[in-house]
Amino acid sequence: MKVRASVKKMCDKCRVIRRHGRVMVICTASPRHKQRQG
């Protein structure tokens, strides 16, 4: 899980979602693309 100031989709399988008021990126194709804003 990368913690970044700005989260972006890294591939076309990435999805931007909100959990508990935080913006996150989850990816089914490659879990290395997981990010959280903070």
UniProtKB/Swiss-Prot annotation:
GO terms for cellular component: cytoplasm; ribonucleoprotein complex; ribosome. Keywords: Ribonucleoprotein, Ribosomal protein. InterPro entries: Ribosomal_bL36, Ribosomal_bL36_sp. GO terms for molecular function: structural constituent of ribosome. One of its GO terms (biological process) is translation. Coiled coil: none annotated. Belongs to the bacterial ribosomal protein bL36 family. HAMAP family: Ribosomal_bL36. This is Large ribosomal subunit protein bL36B. It comes from Prochlorococcus marinus (strain MIT 9515). The lineage of its organism: Bacteria, Bacillati, Cyanobacteriota, Cyanophyceae, Synechococcales. The gene is rpmJ2.
